[in-house]
Amino acid sequence: MTTANSEEKTYPIFTVRWLSVHALGIPTIFFLGAITAMQFIQR
């Protein structure tokens, strides 16, 4: 955090980490909501 020279040159935000977080986070929340809704609809 003190010296961010190498990190500023490359963009660590738009990398595999960003893709994995969004590719695994959004669908997980969506599926969790769908499963919860189905549980309430069944009974």
Swiss-Prot record:
Heme binds at H22. It is found in: Plastid, Chloroplast thylakoid membrane. Keywords: Chloroplast, Electron transport, Heme, Iron, Membrane, Metal-binding, Photosynthesis, Photosystem II, Plastid, Thylakoid, Transmembrane, Transmembrane helix, Transport. The chain crosses the membrane at residues 18-34. Its cofactor is heme b. This b-type cytochrome is tightly associated with the reaction center of photosystem II (PSII). PSII is a light-driven water:plastoquinone oxidoreductase that uses light energy to abstract electrons from H(2)O, generating O(2) and a proton gradient subsequently used for ATP formation. It consists of a core antenna complex that captures photons, and an electron transfer chain that converts photonic excitation into a charge separation. NCBIfam families: cyt_b559_beta. This is Cytochrome b559 subunit beta. It comes from Stigeoclonium helveticum.
